[in-house]
Amino acid sequence: MRNWLKSLPINLKNQVLSLDGKRLRGVSNNEHITHLVELFATESRLVIAQEKVPDKKGERKALPSLLKSIDVTGAIISMDAHYTYKPELSQVLEAGADYIVGIKGNQGRLHAEIENYFTQAHAISYDSEEFECYTEADKGHGRLETRSVCVSCDLGWLGERESWGFGALIEVRSQREIKGKTSKEVRYYGSSRKGTAKEFARWIRDHWLVENGLHYVLDVVFREDDARANTGYAAENLSLFRRMAMNVIKAFDPKRGFEDARRSAAFEPAYLGGLLSKLFGARC
């Protein structure tokens, strides 16, 4: 799959690559766990790298291999707080990419300093060319969500900014209204890249496309969690084939839904042959 992906005219520069893990629940139990870590190109909607790890705790160890498997120069790799450690962030920068990473309690002091900074900035209505806010709203299916994204490139107060490689800090304040009930959440991020508040709003939002664009399709269309094959490398190999099928459909018939494409491939030999020819380079 890696060699085939390299042959595609994909431009990863400035594209958000969502790094996320997925446990194959159908073949996982207390004695046998199949856990995968993947890089998902959110604009191209392609799985561009995949590694098997023992469990979620082992996800960080897969990062060097993932970064070496494909050229990520100029891309933006988005990661959850599980990766908020200096060695991992340095690996991303050394690969020629930028990062956006969540900051939570696993970096307690850093999280507290950032939270305090943004709290004070709002309290005094901080006005600076290096501090900007942007608000957006989504409405649908009885839900209204409003997000306020504030970005600061004024990091002179942060003593370890250089060792972290931060170029910007981001605060996202979300308010959701569902069936008359309101919930609020505040999240913080660090990034090696500088950008506008509107750009960071899109980049952070794009990270979650891995849920609908990859995990949902695998679970609902390909029924991955219903698969039971776990002998040897069966689970890992079958997971790779599912992702290859997704990539072929998305790369060469992007306007067609996955369910429709699978049905056509099953009942229309010409359509199946066309897809396979794109994958193997010869008419089937």
Placement of each model-derived feature along the sequence:
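Short amphipathic alpha-helical "interface-anchor" segments enriched in bulky aromatics
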Residues: 190, 194-229
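A residue-level signal for conserved active-site and pocket-lining positions in enzyme catalytic cores
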Residues: 20, 99, 189, 211, ...
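A short alpha/beta connector and helix-capping loop motif
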Residues: 34-35, 86-104
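Generic secondary-structure signature for well-ordered alpha-helical cores
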Residues: 6, 68, 97, 119, ...
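An anionic, glycine-rich sequence signature occurring as long contiguous blocks
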Residues: 104-205
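A short, flexible helix-boundary coil/loop motif
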Residues: 217-284
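Conserved, well-structured functional cores that handle cations and Mg-NTP chemistry
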Residues: 1-79, 84-87, 255-257
